[in-house]
Amino acid sequence: MKLILIKDCPSGKANTIVEVSDGYAKNFLIPRKFAIAYTEENAKKLKQKLEQEKLDFSLKTKEFLELKEKLEKLKLTFKLKASLDKNHKLETHHSISAKKLLERLHELGFDLPKHSIEKVHLNLIGINHVNVKLFDKIVAKLTVVIEADV
């Protein structure tokens, strides 16, 4: 029996056309909503759905590439309390977390989900870079400048 898979299952991935035995289709795949019967109408719907998903994906990709450019031009500056250690080097007492970075980005008008920035604790004075995962394989490199407040 020819079917169109709706969900991923042992027979294949979602949105694919497969050929399986009649019993497997009638007793397992169709009742459990893994698949629907193959008809010309369902095949047209599948084709339209795949074209729409492809279009949506390309639009989202374009959107997130523009966001990536904006984020990479941005420089976030933070001040951390610091003091000289016994070797006369600056030592910070706090760090900048991913949560603080997201809060600052939110203040600047960038609404990103909290999982988009990997867990970081920046405490090195100077220029730091943080990866921001935006969409699929689009990752922006955010520049964070930490200054010493002595």
Swiss-Prot record:
Any single biological process term in GO: translation
Q: Name one GO cellular component term.
A: ribonucleoprotein complex
Q: What is the lineage of its organism?
A: Bacteria, Bacillati, Mycoplasmatota, Mycoplasmoidales, Metamycoplasmataceae
Which Pfam families has this protein been placed in?
Ribosomal_L9_C, Ribosomal_L9_N
Tell me the gene name: rplI
**Family as reported in the entry's similarity comment:** Belongs to the bacterial ribosomal protein bL9 family.
Function recorded in the entry:
Binds to the 23S rRNA.
- Say yes or no: keyword rRNA-binding present: yes
Domain of life according to the entry: Bacteria
Question: Which keywords has UniProt assigned to this entry?
Answer: Ribonucleoprotein, Ribosomal protein, RNA-binding, rRNA-binding
- Which pairs of Cys residues are joined through disulfide bonds in the record? none
Q: What InterPro entries does the annotation carry?
A: Ribosomal_bL9 (IPR000244), Ribosomal_bL9/RNase_H1_N (IPR009027), Ribosomal_bL9_bac/chp (IPR020594), Ribosomal_bL9_C (IPR020069), Ribosomal_bL9_C_sf (IPR036791), Ribosomal_bL9_N (IPR020070), Ribosomal_bL9_N_sf (IPR036935)
Q: Which GO terms describe its molecular function?
A: rRNA binding; structural constituent of ribosome
What is the name of the protein in this document?
Large ribosomal subunit protein bL9
